[in-house]
């Protein structure tokens, strides 16, 4: 008899060449996996018979279970006696989905996606909107990576006072990037003074006349803050070692049964909050050029960590056929893979269309992060006038 492992390696390609019994084992595995993903509960022989396999006796199903368990595709739940698919079974199930017709996407979802912009200069903000919508539909945390876009321009500055000698500055750009800094104020300032300085700098950035009359002290402080913020911004813009990462919806994990276990929740949150690891997964997904699932132990094998007990799916997005980054979702092991995969593809296609339209209309270009060796150089330091970043908005935004 052909072993279960050989049957599964071939998946659908092997169906026409194997015995009816071996094909039935494959059906049992996928039916068990699908039922587990739907309910999140261990699957018993009686439940499987009632749901998918009415032509088989419970004894026959248990025999198939035993064979699949011996091959490492199912594990027994000691409380209920039902079976749970292993990471290996889930991997074969996900690979199998590529051979199946994609699940239908409802009209309301298409309507929501159609409301996303068809072209835009505010690229990062629109990518955030798209991933927020994806997370809302799937009820899962979402994230995406992005390169730095050339010819961006600073459009606004906000200053929030923390106390009399500390303030948080927020810079926003035309392409939707946001940068924050906490700055030390050389002299104590009151709230009204900070607000006058903020309004003065907002007009200064936009080359607009200002009605704010600043004292000598406030004028000196405003330019001191401006110079500090601009230098920090240019440093970030010109020197970055990894793609920008944007994440949202972390609290959605709390809705899932698996994450009610404090240890599993801590591992999942730890992964989601680790920028380096998330960027690594997105980078792998981007270079694979297709939707890629990382399931359970696969994550620990790639990242060199303990098994986080969750799954991640990523998919690349493009601008004029050039890969820009990837977007993804994170959730429990029993993710709704059948629904999530086509939805991710749909969102990626929409983003591709928007970015390609924007590429031609706004002449967009971008830069990848560069890793550099920390060595002293005799070359002159990069001067700001040679940078493609602009401190003032382009004419189209004025």
Swiss-Prot record:
- Physiological role: Negative regulator of class I heat shock genes (grpE-dnaK-dnaJ and groELS operons). Prevents heat-shock induction of these operons.
Q: Offer one example of a GO biological process linked to this entry.
A: negative regulation of DNA-templated transcription
Q: What is this protein called?
A: Heat-inducible transcription repressor HrcA
Cite the entry's keywords alphabetically.
Repressor, Stress response, Transcription, Transcription regulation
Family according to the record = Belongs to the HrcA family.
Q: Which domain of life is it from?
A: Bacteria
* InterPro entries, sorted: GAF-like_dom_sf, HrcA, HrcA_C, WH-like_DNA-bd_sf, WH_DNA-bd_sf
Q: Which GO molecular function annotation, any one, does this entry have? A: DNA binding
Indicate whether Repressor appears among the record's keywords.
yes
What is the organism of origin for this protein?
Chlamydia pneumoniae
